[in-house]
Amino acid sequence: MDHIRNFSIIAHIDHGKSTLADRIIQLCGGLSDREMEAQVLDSMDIEKERGITIKAQTAALTYKARDGKVYNLNLIDTPGHVDFSYEVSRSLSACEGALLVVDASQGVEAQTVANCYTAIELGVEVVPVLNKIDLPQADPANAIQEIEDVIGIDAHDATPCSAKTGQGVEDVIEALIAKVPPPKGDASAPLQALIIDSWFDNYVGVVMLVRVVNGTLRPKDKALLMATGAQHLVEQVGVFSPKSVQRDSLTAGQVGFVIAGIKELKAAKVGDTITTLPRKAEAPLPGFKEVKPQVFAGLYPVEANQYEALRESLEKLRLNDASLMFEPEVSQALGFGFRCGFLGLLHMEIVQERLEREFDMDLITTAPTVVYQVQMRDGTMVTVENPAKMPDPSRIEAILEPIVTVNLYMPQEYVGSVITLCTQKRGSQINMSYHGKQVQLTYEIPMAEIVMDFFDRLKSVSRGYASMDYEFKEYRPSDVVKVDILINSDKVDALSVIVHRSNSQYRGREVAAKMREIIPRQMYDVAIQAAIGSNIIARENVKALRKNVLAKCYGGDISRKKKLLEKQKAGKKRMKQVGTVEIPQEAFLAILQVDDK
């Protein structure tokens, strides 16, 4: 036990977490130089391209230290993005230590801090590391100062290294061995193993990544999953080095994988506890919670006959992503599709991108919405995740919307513009503090404002320097209304949005104006209206195309011309009664791009 160290690496996007992991694996001989490639632990293409880590991965390494002893290092790679914060907290609770990687040229950023606080709350020993010291603009002294000011941990002896060139990586491992305590646990006690992650393998079913806290797990054991109460027979156990290697057993303190012939990912929930029968553990490990989707959007196939293919693709994605929810939905404008729930905006983008990329789907996506709670007059509570399902306003007592606490970090010259942005988004300031040249702002902002375009706007007002993370706080009553878009007085359900009343007039006008540019001219006039309930708040017209019916007249009597024009008018009127307006794909995207004033 004394020679085991379980650790993970915490860092903001692009601070060099995966590269450092690569170097540590290489140094410990986990992979030969031939098998080594950049970002070994990021197994999805999209992870490598966006430079983010989505799923947790592990590597069990052996390292011969300078004191001559051989240590077993278990590296648990964590996702860094706020959407996956639950996965981060599970990965961290499986560790005793965490390397806090800070880019020496950029200093501390929001997600570093968010994950670092999670680590400190879980009682994990944090070891600061300064990366990218080979860069000419690196400023280690300033970075150390920021770590001490912002996070409040002692960083005077932070290890400098450069993951890219490999310089100082050994010192990082030595510091890790010196500062991180070995795991505690009793190998002879009843089994308690924490599921850090799980994914689906086509050959063996669900593979669970576990950290054994107490006890020993062997093949042929009867495993019991405590959250669901399901029983399975363990088929094989082993470790990743990062290639999978089978072992005879996993004992307390170790991290490895378990295969137990589970067919559905839903059965192996991240954060659940595995124990064995007949000697089962008294209680599960703390910290398990069901992950709830926060952002909803409709996904529709462009071709109606692709509906089944889309269902299959979503099913396949769900095999590897238990937090993705979906249910069938019908829209008059878009036909059959699915209402999908995501953890956050990044999660939504990734799912869309994987559907388009890995499954070749052409998709129409509706505007993302959040979940509202509606207090009805008769005292019942309804949750609404789709604007089209909002009950009749006359039956509603109050609408509650989700509020999130947002932490923003930025250089002080951008504070003014970031505060302006937060105020536009109906935010209320909670706190503001200066750390050297960095400023930390804390705001409470309605989640609906964040899912629209907050992140993009934040990056543009701060020239890319601001970083943010957010967490759900509570539901609060709010004066929000549903704005419907009518085309030739037919409601287009997929274009409905829920907005704050103060912004509804502007929003309605803008959307109508945008639609007018996008809808192609028809053979008859098309009226585009925005309405709240039965109140029309904006209207735009798309003028009809018409043939010049007088071209063949040359002079001639006025009554002849009138007759031709009247005839044309009557024809257009008939057309309008039977015609339907095709709404192009861009119209649905246009809704997303309406800037707030």
UniProtKB/Swiss-Prot annotation:
Domain (tr-type G): residue spans on this chain: 2-184
Reaction(s) the record says it catalyses: GTP + H2O = GDP + phosphate + H(+)
Keyword Hydrolase annotated: yes
Key words, A-Z: Cell inner membrane, Cell membrane, GTP-binding, Hydrolase, Membrane, Nucleotide-binding, Protein biosynthesis
Compartmental location: Cell inner membrane
Gene Ontology MF terms: GTP binding; GTPase activity; guanosine tetraphosphate binding; ribosome binding; translation elongation factor activity
InterPro entries (UniProt xref): EF-4 (IPR006297), EFG_III/V (IPR035647), EFG_V-like (IPR000640), EFTu-like_2 (IPR004161), G_TR_CS (IPR031157), LepA_C_sf (IPR038363), LepA_CTD (IPR013842), LepA_IV (IPR035654)
Matches recorded under PANTHER family: TRANSLATION FACTOR GUF1 HOMOLOG, CHLOROPLASTIC, TRANSLATION FACTOR GUF1-RELATED
Family: Belongs to the TRAFAC class translation factor GTPase superfamily. Classic translation factor GTPase family. LepA subfamily.
Protein name stated in the entry: Elongation factor 4
Protein species of origin: Cupriavidus pinatubonensis (strain JMP 134 / LMG 1197)
